[in-house]
């Protein structure tokens, strides 16, 4: 199957998923990549520490605005990548008609991406590092 539209999901859509979205878009500029949250802080920008972590890699995520995951949004995308096994299970149960397109972003490296929300900047660096490796692991599947 060809994946042309990818949705990256975390909880609030202000820390991990904006980073994952930016890294995927950077690696695959020909694809449509967006993000959403299970309990999104709708309309909020990316967390300042997420912005700082990505600035250090010369990736600007300041224009990001959080949006809520919905059934309609799920239907729009070919592949939906979440941060943990728990999120993957929840999404497959609650969006059962879309379950075949839901995967953990760290599927190929067998890792969850820890939530750095309200934690020190080093936790954002750790999440960014895992997301970078996870995105790299999808490279040949999305090309």
Label every PLM stretch briefly.
Residues 8, 81-82:
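Hydrophobic beta-strand core positions in alpha/beta domains
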Residues 79, 85-143:
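Phosphate-binding/catalytic loops
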Residues 1-75, 140:
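Conserved active-site segments centered on acidic
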